[in-house]
């Protein structure tokens, strides 16, 4: 029987999913393997009738540059009991599968490791290689290397953000944007930097003080006042949704928003418009202060996850897909495929990235100590400093409370 590989996609979509799947398929087909695509992520491996598709070369070529994921995705994460009671070992043995390729985030990678260990215990060892994916750019790849999909999502987000900024200048309004990023602020920061937004708020900025609703609002108010002093009655702020994940339960209650929570205890941010929440809080504060300004909310959410992949990610994802075969041919397993800026392929072992205490892969955060971040704060952001206190008194009696550095407790 011809040897086969199985490939699945887990978690949420990101631009480049189909490029990875298509590139993996093309490479292995040329080497004589059968390529089996699994729909619904890991769900199919834990029931007797998985939804599968044999991917041939024309199909791989057809999906290569399409947005979304040809293989339907799922966030299903099996319990330990599922392995003993529901795992479809017959799928692997009947199809002579030698490699499981998983495309997703850290949860998808961890489950792949569990499956490989389970199959080894059942005397049917297979290789597993993971392709790291997230528009949040928060997987701990070597410095300067993005996760695939991030650059495309940033590009599409910036298209919207640029148009919004032009609208702000044209109409004399402010806009409050919210960008995805549960654990890290890479997407919000990247979009804000690209579009020269006068205020960017990400969770990493609160390294010396607790994140509160008041501080988030005051940062935007600081920018509004500073711009007025500069003679500009318009502007835009982009805020990472990750600030909500860092808020205490008490602070979330203060926001007045009633969240539902997922099984892991995280507020289900996808069910509400974060931009609307932020905008309402800001509108309330400017009204209390008597500052004349209109603001409008814009959510940078699900619509950027399935956008057409830009050239950067088309190339990068192709290299990742081809790199999977290189690592497999070298006998590598239990690893993520990594491609450096020169196109060199190497493995990153999940065991080396995991937190030794929790076993989880920690997120890569925005480096607020970097020259890049500092230059954005110093040259692009507009916010109150001590030099503005006197001029700011025409808008607020206590301008020091809206001092950018004091809000964040930065020296």
Which residues are covered by each model-predicted region?
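N-terminal phosphate-binding or glycine-rich loops at protein starts, especially the Walker A/P-loop
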Residues: 1-49
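Gly-rich Lys/Arg/Thr-decorated short loops/hinges at beta-loop-alpha junctions or inter-strand turns
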Residues: 4-7, 63-75, 133-145, 170-172, ...
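Short, ordered loop/turn segments at secondary-structure junctions
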Residues: 10-12, 33, 38-43, 75-76, ...
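Short glycine/serine/threonine-rich phosphate/pyrophosphate-binding segments
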Residues: 14-24, 45-46, 82-86, 106-114, ...
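Accessory alpha-helical/coil subdomains and C-terminal extensions
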Residues: 35, 91, 99-104, 110-125, ...
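Glycine-rich oxoanion-binding loops at beta->alpha junctions
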Residues: 46-98, 108, 135, 145-155, ...
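C-terminal non-catalytic interaction/assembly regions of soluble proteins
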Residues: 251-411
